[in-house]
């Protein structure tokens, strides 16, 4: 009701008033869950927000109202009063006129994206440092080649784009490609984002998009999407789900992260659905429906063991320096919130499975006597790697959704 087109301000004005900390592009720290990795996405064109960590979402008035415990009407009044003070509003309007949003391309069909990405990856090398990284994770050279992991190019981007055009590839609508100020096609690779590319494949093995596994994580984020949203002729990658293994398998496993899921597949032989993050459960549903139409009869959730994270305050957590309690309580508020967010996301997946009449169980490992995570083996890929290396790893335990989490 209050987020319509008749407003003379937008969500970026609200963000300015709230003094949210910007990390990159339209990503900010979340004031609701205390995230400091820039997981709150602001969508200026639609005047909406969504946190990929705590899943809070809504319009610009809800963003302000929820933080100040106001009604939408009260929030609207306060925002208007604040913007009418000083010259901020006039300066912001002038800036918007001078910097019009670049025209974006419509997302290209899957077959177009697949061919362009495949040709691009064929032209790229895999640096020794990245090859060693992948081998240390438990992959073989044959598997690395099969998945087409390649290093991010740091120069020659115009020439690479031209080579793809000469091969008959389409670049318009393919995330990561855009036109520079002269109209030449190029690619959104930057030196600060060096790393290796992780193709994200559909059920049928087509490359939908690519992620970059960063050499140097930024704000504790290890992955970035190869995207050109906000650039002339560019487009967003979205957050597609990676699928690897037999698409006709009766039992399918769900985890977080395409690289993790691919490693787990190669180490176990199981079929994996790999969401980009635990809160990306909305993207998981259409994949589950597609696999149900084949032969899938059961889902096994294998998210990281953070879902059983101990919440004791041990004064050893990486958030301790930011905690106002300074270890003066029995439980760590940051651990409690992190565990709540992950378990809530798991619950969303279980809810989707109930709606689809799809049996689902949960897989856990490396637990202590209280059933909490023992802190040694975090991911499903780590678990299978430990098993293969004949290290001490407890047998997996699968529990029904109805059991205590």
Predicted segments with their positions:
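Short, surface-exposed acidic
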Residues: 22-26, 70-79, 85-92, 138-149, ...
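Residue-level preference for well-ordered alpha-helical positions
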Residues: 65, 80, 135-136, 144, ...
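Phosphate-handling DNA/RNA-contact segment within nucleic-acid enzymes
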Residues: 159-295, 313
């Amino acid at each position: 009701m209050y987020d319509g087109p008749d407003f003379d301000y937008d969500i970026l004005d609200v963000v300015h008033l709230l003094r949210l900390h910007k990390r990159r592009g339209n990503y900010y720290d979340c004031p609701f869950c205390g995230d400091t990795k820039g997981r709150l996405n602001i969508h200026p064109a639609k005047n909406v927000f969504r946190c990929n960590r705590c899943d809070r979402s809504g319009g610009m008035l809800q963003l302000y109202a929820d933080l100040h415990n106001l009604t939408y009407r009260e929030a609207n009044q306060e925002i208007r009063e604040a913007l009418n003070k000083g010259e901020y509003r006039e300066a912001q309007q002038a800036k918007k006129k001078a910097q019009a949003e670049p025209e974006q391309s419509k997302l290209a069909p899957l077959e177009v994206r697949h061919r362009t990405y495949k040709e691009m990856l064929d032209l790229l090398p895999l640096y020794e440092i990245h090859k060693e990284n992948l081998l240390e994770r438990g992959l073989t050279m044959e598997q690395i080649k099969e998945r087409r992991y390649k290093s991010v190019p740091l120069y020659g981007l115009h020439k690479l784009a031209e080579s793809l055009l000469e091969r008959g590839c389409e670049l318009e609508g393919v995330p990561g490609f855009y036109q520079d100020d002269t109209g030449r096609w190029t690619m959104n690779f930057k030196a600060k984002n060096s790393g290796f590319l992780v193709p994200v494949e559909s059920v049928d093995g087509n490359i939908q998009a690519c992620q970059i596994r960063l050499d140097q994580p930024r704000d504790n984020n290890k992955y970035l999407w190869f995207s050109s949203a906000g650039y002339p002729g560019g487009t967003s990658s979205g957050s597609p789900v990676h699928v690897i293994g037999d698409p006709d398998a009766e039992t399918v496993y769900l985890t977080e992260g395409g690289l993790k899921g691919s490693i787990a597949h190669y180490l176990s032989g199981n079929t994996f659905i790999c969401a980009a993050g635990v809160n990306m459960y909305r993207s998981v549903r259409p994949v589950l429906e597609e696999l149900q139409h084949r032969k899938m009869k059961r889902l096994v959730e294998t998210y990281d063991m953070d879902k059983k994270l101990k919440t004791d305050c041990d004064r050893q957590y990486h958030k301790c320096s930011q905690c106002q309690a300074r270890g003066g309580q029995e439980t760590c508020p940051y651990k409690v919130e992190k565990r709540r967010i992950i378990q809530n996301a798991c619950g969303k997946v279980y809810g989707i499975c109930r709606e689809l009449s799809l049996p689902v169980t949960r897989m856990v490992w490396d637990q202590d006597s209280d059933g909490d995570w023992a802190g040694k083996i975090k991911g499903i890929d780590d678990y299978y790697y430990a098993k293969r290396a004949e290290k001490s790893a407890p047998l997996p335990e699968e529990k029904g959704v109805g059991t205590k989490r």
